[in-house]
A protein has these predicted regions:
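Intrinsic low-complexity/IDR segments
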Residues: 1-5, 21, 25, 35, ...
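Extreme N-terminal basic, low-complexity initiation segments
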Residues: 2-12, 17
Length: 195
């Protein structure tokens, strides 16, 4: 595996590069083209990936602890089991990214708040935005579903697709669905079975 620790790769064209297990700790990858790059299990701790193109990149099990991903394009990237702890994802494009089992503890989300703040304040506010209580949404079995038939957003807004949600809230609904489908949003209240 390549050792590129602290390397200056700003604006580098690494499209489709095979960087599996590479050491890119503290590397400067600002505005780098990493479209479709294979970064499986790469060490990108504290790397600067601001405005990098990571569309369709394979970042499974990558270490992105404390990485700067501000304004990075992670559309359709595979971030399964990635360590994003304390990473900065403000203004990043996470559309269709796979975040299954990713560690977002202390991470800043693309909307500017820390993941913990998102869970504590944004999730309850979004769930209750249309007038239902969190308890009503949970009681409807919304945390048992990962489709638009009765997922939390379907229950909260009485809709079956994102486009039917209030326009002002669609970006937040999209964000919630991505994080929920990745299993990263726990049920906000204990159910009777857990209880």
């Amino acid at each position: 595996s390549a050792n590129l620790q602290s390397a200056d790769l700003q604006s580098a064209n690494l499209r489709s590069a095979d960087l599996r297990y590479a050491n890119l700790q503290s590397a400067d990858l600002r505005s780098a083209n990493l479209h479709s790059a294979n970064l499986h299990s790469a060490n990108l701790q504290s790397a600067n990936l601001q405005s990098a193109d990571l569309r369709y990149a394979d970042l499974r099990s990558a270490n992105l602890h404390s990485a700067n991903l501000q304004s990075a394009n992670l559309q359709s990237a595979d971030l399964q089991s990635a360590n994003l702890r304390s990473a900065d994802l403000r203004y990043a494009n996470l559309q269709s990214a796979d975040l299954q089992s990713a560690d977002l503890q202390y991470a800043y989300l693309e909307t500017g708040e820390r993941f913990s703040e998102y869970l504590e304040t944004v999730v309850p506010a979004l769930l209750t935005a249309a007038g239902k209580t969190v308890e009503q949404i949970v009681a409807a079995g919304a945390w048992d579903c990962h489709s638009w038939t009765n997922c939390p957003m379907a229950e909260a807004f009485g809709v079956h697709q994102e486009e039917d949600c209030p326009p002002l809230l669609r970006p937040r609904v999209r964000q919630f669905v991505a994080l929920f489908d990745a299993g990263l949003i726990p049920c906000p209240i204990a159910t009777a079975e857990e209880g």
